[in-house]
Amino acid sequence: MISYIIYNLSSIIYNLSSIIYSLSSLSSLENKIMEVQFDKTKTLNALLFVANRVQRKDFHKIFKIIYFADRQHLADWGRPITGDTYVAMEAGPVPSRLYDMLKMVRGDSYMPDSEGLSQYFQIENWMYVKPLQDADLNRLSPNEQEALSDAIAKYASLSYDQIKEKSHDVAWRSTARDFSISWDNIAREAGLDGEELECLNEYARLEAALS
């Protein structure tokens, strides 16, 4: 009887170990983050590109249009335009580095506008971008311009609630509020499968090693 109990306990422990190992492997796979680099120059020019081409230039609309453009460019070309870190806020994804840039110019950032961003745009009524220059198109590839133009065409005319709902995609819903959305999840939302995602990660690692 005791031998039988010991045997069963051993089997249970073995099965639990297998489950824990499987969960650990799955967690490792799920937490594999795409190695995306933030590009401040492209982000600034994406902002100017959008702000000069939409009628309503509020933060919310601009943030969402750039998010959709980043997502589409990732699907089409294997990398986003800006490489920003999107935070899953209640109203949808917010590009945190771009938001910091806007706050520098607005004057409520803990960082001063030491790089002279105010020569490119101003902030009016706390939440509207007034572009002072157009985008430097030499800083945005034709494919990046196309992704931004497509996002403007699809989403610029939507209301606040409509574009908010569109931005509440699977990548946003799978992330806790006020946490960063992983680029892996954005890639899956863009339609990339696991094999394509692994290829992108491998390419990013090789590119980083050669840079």
Descriptions of predicted regions:
Residues 5-7, 14, 18-211:
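Domain-edge interaction signal
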